[in-house]
Curated annotation (Swiss-Prot):
Chain sites annotated for binding substrate: D16, S17, Y48, G49, N80, T81, T192, H193
Coiled-coil ranges (or none): none
Keyword terms: Cell shape, Cell wall biogenesis/degradation, Isomerase, Peptidoglycan synthesis
Ubl conjugation is among the record's keywords: no
Reaction(s) catalysed by this chain's protein: L-glutamate = D-glutamate
Pathway(s) per entry: Cell wall biogenesis; peptidoglycan biosynthesis
Organism of this sequence: Chlorobaculum tepidum (strain ATCC 49652 / DSM 12025 / NBRC 103806 / TLS) (Chlorobium tepidum)
UniProt-recorded name of the protein: Glutamate racemase
Class in the EC hierarchy, top level: isomerase
Function, in words: Provides the (R)-glutamate required for cell wall biosynthesis.
Highest taxon of the lineage: Bacteria
Family that this chain belongs to: Belongs to the aspartate/glutamate racemases family.
Gene name of the encoded protein: murI
Active site: C79, C191
Amino acid sequence: MPQHKVSSDSPIGIFDSGIGGLTVVKAVQAALPSERIIYFGDTARVPYGSKSQVTIRKYAREDTELLMKHQPKLIIVACNTVSALALDVVEQTAGGIPVIGVLKAGAELAVQKTKSGRIGVIGTQATIGSNAYTCAIREEKETLEVFPKACPLFVPLAEEGFIDHPATRLVAEEYLAAFTGKEIDTLVLGCTHYPILRKIIESITGPEITIIDSAEAVASKAGELLAARGLLNQSPEKALPHLMVSDLPQKFRELYRLFMGTELPDVELVGM
């Protein structure tokens, strides 16, 4: 049983290490515009992907505890690193509240989309090092070939707002050269920061490679889960997200405006 009573009006809690989870917020808002969203970006401790597993699991517990104070009906882990290394910690801390991780949703979508059976995955050092994407993809279909590549500089570039910048293009060209000759037809953006850089990534990979953004898959999964439990918010009003960060709220506002293309309500600064 959940730790608290939930209703259709209860919020969806979403967390990530920084601004990357806004890609999930955007997808959930598009799919489920009436839902109230509580978002936490751990901007004081970003990036998670270069931390140890012990530290990542500690952060995952603390982030979930923060969201649980808002009595959510669903928690979305908008961080592939946590999805890969600490989803069990989130589930334990959530105490019966359903949890959706971006990693499994992205893996399932990649399996659906590939025609050649050759899938590339880019992610943080921790996510790629965990082998979680390869395992999740082969769990769906064991004959598929998976080519992983760690891209550790993408998160800091996104956090700096270098969305369409020559430095980002140079780094992306270096990383994506790893797929030359691999004949992949599908590329998983295995970090929620990476869709922020999607325009540059797509310009390098070309139109013949299908880009998998797990944010859209997660939003679809969230809608299905809430509908099955009778917890969809039926309000005709569009809800604005409640945004929390652990550092630099003004910078977060600027990046939110840049990425989401809209003004936003106040950003709450919380201590961790």
